A protein has these predicted regions:
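Aromatic-lined ligand-binding clefts that engage carbohydrates, nucleic acids, or primary amines
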Residues: 1-7, 55
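An acidic-aromatic loop/edge-strand motif
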Residues: 16, 25-80
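Surface-exposed, short loops/turns at beta-strand junctions within beta-sandwich domains
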Residues: 47-49, 137-145, 544-549
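Acidic, histidine-bearing metal-coordination/catalytic regions of metal-dependent phosphoesterases
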Residues: 80-184, 191, 195-204, 325, ...
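Extended active-site neighborhood of metal-dependent phosphoesterases/phosphodiesterases
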Residues: 145-169, 222-325, 340-353, 379-428, ...
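Active-site neighborhood of phospho(di)ester-bond hydrolases with catalytic His/Asp-centered motifs
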Residues: 178-181, 208-214, 241-248, 297, ...
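Short, composition-biased motifs enriched in small/polar/acidic residues
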Residues: 484-559
């Protein structure tokens, strides 16, 4: 059977997918108990029109030799209202947040909230009858956990211990950021990436959650968003604000300003979460702790330096005083994955028009997707040409950025500092991988592997981790700010039972001694606690009764 309401298909059972006609057979025979089995479906009331509605059914035999045919149906109304999407959170700031949800029929909107699950003492209410509910909570306390419920007067449609959010902190704190690029496949690949992060971050809450575009394949329809985002992350959406950007696939199901993305999400247009007002959902900025986030639209907005988007971005960056600046958009300025930044207009224009502005205002990290791979650059500045134009001078640090190898990337400035280098990451493998040459000269590492990006910001330290879908860490690096010189071992001495290490240091910077009993040096553990430097050279020593000749020592920068 196939059911239609007002000419729109609403249900299909035991019929093949795709177009059918009077000659299409049912998939299997129905016999015995199956002949009296009823199926219950829930009808979306938004499909009902005022006045007369038409419910039609077409019933198909399983073969041309069948001689009996029966069908029965009933339609009944219920007073039960159900949430069909969400709730989900938008516009999180120190003092406010937006709670959204969708109901299967029009109701008033009510959010109750408070500091404990048993005392939701505050509320916001809107008497308009709507199915798309969007309620702004204000006058909240920074860095505070609130529980909430959603519904309408007299009815709670959703509440419980996992209905909560934490407002952004007023002061600096350790911040965990999770970024997903091109994740919207709604398949096992996306699920494995999701689950790997859940295991990796178990016990460590996510503070900022980013999606880098192509969030719902293949056309960014409302139904595809339901499967790839809302059904994929229902728990996380209830207590984490989701910050998104527009990918090319977001635009395939609508015209310039009417694709579903713009109706599903409510990013800050009027500086509700910091930064300057953009006046549009397509690009915006926000602050969290000591990080300023800049979201640009690389798909539908004017990418020229004098266009509305970059005029706003320059003013926004000029007003930014945060310690860190992270920009994100969909089309990467450098890639040789499933897309090529030497060939595609959006990628070329973001590199040639946008990067000079961002680097002039001291951007630290740029995240994008589009290429279904993972690529991570060196610490770069001033590279705005094609891949064959790469010169050594554009690499401010040609090392790995790993403390245990060539050392972290260092930037002497505190806060936005022009042309001290940025790292560019393509993290477009959160839902699929598509290969490519993976040989762009700007990149230190290029991987055709599924995964997501985890960032941990702690004061003047930013640590990045590429986490595979199988839980393995396949890349990591660190950026340190306020550092004018690299850590150099100035003396290392083993004499009898004494180990002595001295190194160049900067007053106020924290170090640790780590040791390894592995001759390959691939398993390290902290041997000391924090050692805070008070001068330009710091030393440490210890005595050992029986020193292992294969033991290794190293000095690492903590922050």
């Amino acid at each position: 059977v196939i059911l239609y309401l007002n000419g729109v298909e609403i249900y299909r059972n035991n019929m093949p997918a795709g177009l059918v006609d009077s000659h299409t057979f049912a998939v299997t025979n129905v016999f015995g108990a199956g002949e009296s089995t009823f199926y219950s479906i829930k009808l979306d009331t938004s499909l009902l029109a005022p006045g007369i509605n038409f419910l039609a059914a077409e019933v198909h035999q399983a073969g041309s030799d069948s001689i009996d045919l029966s069908f029965d149906a009933s339609l009944s109304a219920s007073n039960v209202v159900l949430i069909t999407r969400g709730p989900y959170l938008q516009q999180g700031s120190e003092t406010g947040i937006v709670v959204r949800w969708r109901s299967d029929r029009g109701t008033e909107s009510l959010v109750k909230y408070g500091a404990s699950l048993d005392n939701l003492a505050f509320s916001v209410h809107d008497s308009a009858l709507v199915t798309e509910h969007e309620m702004a909570l204000s006058n909240l306390l920074p860095g505070t956990k609130y529980y909430y419920s959603v519904g309408f007067p007299g009815f709670d449609l959703g509440s419980g211990p996992d209905y909560y959010f934490v407002t952004a902190p007023a002061t600096n704190k350790t911040t965990r950021i999770w970024a997903l690029g091109d994740c919207g496949t709604a398949n096992g690949d996306e699920q494995r990436v999701r689950d790997a992060y859940a295991n990796f971050s178990s016990g460590r809450p996510t503070d900022v959650w980013l999606m880098l575009g192509d969030n719902a394949y293949s056309s960014g329809t409302d139904l595809e968003y339901q499967g790839a985002v809302f059904n994929m992350f229902p728990d996380m959406l209830r207590h984490n604000v989701l910050w998104t950007t527009i990918g090319n696939h977001e635009t395939y199901s609508g015209i310039f300003d009417e694709f579903p993305y713009l109706h599903i999400f409510s990013p800050p247009r009027n500086a509700e979460a910091g930064g300057l007002p953009s006046g549009t959902k397509k690009y915006y900025s926000f602050n969290y702790a000591n990080v300023h986030f800049l979201c640009l639209d690389s798909m539908t907005s004017d990418r020229s330096p004098s266009g509305a988007m970059m005029t706003w971005a320059q003013a926004d960056l000029a007003a930014n005083t945060n310690l860190w600046t992270i920009a994100f958009w969909h089309h990467p300025p450098y890639t040789k994955g499933s897309h090529d930044s030497d060939l595609e207009q959006e990628l070329i224009e973001m590199r040639t028009n946008v990067l000079p502005i961002l680097e002039n205002y001291g951007v630290d990290l740029v995240l994008s997707g589009h290429s279904h791979c993972y690529e991570r650059s060196y610490l770069l500045d001033g590279f705005y040409g094609y891949s064959w134009d790469m010169k050594p001078a554009y690499k401010l640090d040609a090392g790995s950025g790993r403390p245990e190898e060539s050392g972290p990337y260092i930037k002497s400035g505190i806060g936005p500092s022009a042309h001290q280098g940025a790292v560019y990451i393509v993290a477009g493998s959160s839902g699929q991988i598509s290969g490519g040459q993976l040989n762009h000269p700007a990149m230190f590492v290029s991987l055709n592997e599924l995964g997501s990006l985890v960032l941990d910001v702690n004061g003047t330290s930013l640590q990045a981790t590429f986490l595979r879908d199988n839980g393995l860490v396949r890349d990591h690096f660190t950026i340190l700010k306020g550092i004018t010189q690299r850590l150099r071992i100035s003396e290392f001495n083993i004499e009898d039972e004494l180990v002595f290490i001295a190194w160049t240091s900067k007053p106020g910077v924290t170090y640790r001694i780590q040791s390894s009993s592995s001759t390959t040096g691939n398993v390290w553990s902290d041997y000391t606690g924090n050692i805070t430097a008070t001068g330009n050279e710091t030393s440490w020593y210890d005595f050992f009764d029986d020193l292992d000749p294969d033991r290794l020592f190293r000095v690492v920068v903590i922050q």
